[in-house]
């Protein structure tokens, strides 16, 4: 059984934060990272918001890392993408990506469901990866093949789903 933190319990039993409050919380989560990782993550988040218009953004500030999921609904199981941020890294996960055609071999991973592309790793950002035609094609194919399609004309919504009371440091040690 998963232990519920006081923040999770409060989130389930009270009024959810406004969009402005959720944005402030997300900003504080990102600020825990090294400045260059934070800046890269903010730029990546901005690009993803343009590529996945109208997504429900579900934020999990977990023990190990920060995760921002992009979904057509508020159901985590229907999310299509996520940005995952362990210390010193930013990774784009294709949450329904195992069957995506990838002739350029950009996707990493061998699991039955998820594939990923590392965007930032230990001080080596790839700021142009989300502009790469092969990666844009993968994103478009993932959107078109999603179990639940993104609703046309939907407005973006930011939801803080989980905040772990105990967390590992967000800055790389060393």
What are these regions (language model features)?
Residues 1-174:
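Charge-dense, helix-prone N-terminal extensions
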């Amino acid at each position: 059984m998963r232990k519920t933190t006081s923040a999770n319990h409060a989130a389930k039993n009270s009024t959810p934060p406004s969009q402005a409050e959720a944005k402030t919380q997300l900003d504080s989560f990102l600020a825990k990272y090294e400045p260059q990782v934070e800046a890269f993550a903010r730029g990546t988040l901005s690009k993803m918001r343009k590529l996945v218009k109208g997504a429900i953004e579900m934020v999990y500030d977990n023990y190990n890392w920060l995760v921002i999921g992009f979904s057509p609904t508020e159901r985590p199981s229907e999310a299509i993408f996520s940005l995952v941020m362990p210390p010193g890294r930013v990774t784009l996960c294709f949450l329904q990506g195992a069957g995506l055609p990838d002739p350029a071999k950009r996707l990493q991973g061998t699991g039955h469901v998820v594939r990923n592309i590392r965007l930032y790793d230990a001080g080596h950002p790839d700021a142009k990866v989300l502009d790469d035609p092969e990666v844009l094609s993968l994103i478009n194919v993932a959107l078109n093949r999603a179990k639940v399609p993104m609703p046309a004309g939907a407005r973006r919504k930011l939801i803080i789903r989980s905040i772990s009371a105990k967390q590992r440091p967000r800055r790389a040690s060393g």
